Amino acid sequence: MAGNKVAASLAPQDTDTCLRELEHLAARIGLAEVRLDLMASFDVDKLVAASPVPLVLTCRPERERGGFTGPEPERLAVLRAAYDAGAAYIDVETGSLDEVAGWDGSPTRIIASQHWYDTMPADLPEIYLALRDRCDVVKLVGTAHAAADVLPVLELLDKATTPVIGMAMGDPGTCTRLLAPVFPQTLLTYGAIAATHLTAPGQITIDEMTYRYALGAVGPQTSVYLHVTTSDRGDRDVLDRQDRAARGTELHVSLRTTPDDAPALAARMADALPAITVRSA
């Protein structure tokens, strides 16, 4: 999937505020997720009609750590309104896929999402296979507590044959957000509009994605390097490499681990990700 895969994740107060933020961000993003469940009020039809970029509309229930606390039929009605309005995508939890299976008459595509807030399943590629025929896009998000936890996400992105969103929450997972655009089937990678507006742990800002990492310019011509680091100095060296790289020609990303674990982790990453040059710093 070509084009700018950087997506803003927004949780504004109301529709007009959201549209102003989208106008401000439009030149730096390819899509935007709008968290309807975190808004005080919203007009779905106006959002879809006036947005300068394609929208992913989400209404996450409280049981999935979202902000919607009303009855399930009411939440599904919000998603149906977004679907009928012609939003580019709606994000539907995997447990609710049966509820939307019969919807038609709209170009809106369905993202089936599943989150693990405390762990990282080792079998993300297998979970993807079980879901891919039930939706247009599979979104699988786990939590990384250690550097090795990001491997299932990167394997998922590498092996996917249909549109996919995959990332690891938590500080070790930041590298998955930066590497995601490298993989052909990746639909998007989320960024925050500012460091004070993070919507998930491990997020980085759109400005950093755009100006430091040039993710909007990443493509087949980009040489990609994953540096397994063991110190602050190693991390700084990787940032220096990225800052010196010409836009879109090289992507340098660090993954921090312990000195004892670094050689084995780098070997595992290199074996699993042949398209990426893995180095142990």
Task: For the regions a language model picked out, list residue spans one by one.
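Short coil/turn connectors at secondary-structure junctions
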Residues: 2-5, 52-53, 106-107, 161-162, ...
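Active-site beta->alpha loop and helix N-cap motifs at the rims of alpha/beta catalytic domains
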Residues: 2-122, 130, 134, 142
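N-terminal ligand-binding/catalytic initiation module
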Residues: 219, 223-281
